[in-house]
């Protein structure tokens, strides 16, 4: 995911949001899916507006209504970090070091990657393809680091499908217990 920092900040938040959407479709029950997908829609709409102060509390209230279980924890945690990424992207840091939006987007990716039912290769493929598509579309549209994303960028993106959940990865240490 080294290319993540090379795309605009709101595009980074969109990468995180799209991964969340895939995780939500795979991990949440249908009733909870609608609430979580609503938060994803809010995050996506916030990537189309640059320089606004974002109220994340209403989205956090919606997320708090969803009962956390082992099977949906990664999706809910990733939604939290995607929300943080878009909020951070709206107030870029003037300090040196890692950009808060990039850090939050990476934490979003890590939280989904921590689920043992999801292949690391699957995560790498969907995230890197989103980064490549967004980098091309942003470059084509002349979008800079802290610019909002245009409709042109969104038209370049394919729809998100659910991640494929498999059997939890086997830990070789468990064989010796």
Give residue ranges: language-model regions.
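Structured binding/interaction patches within domain cores
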Residues: 2-154, 159, 163-164, 176
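Signal-transducing coiled-coil linker helices
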Residues: 167-168
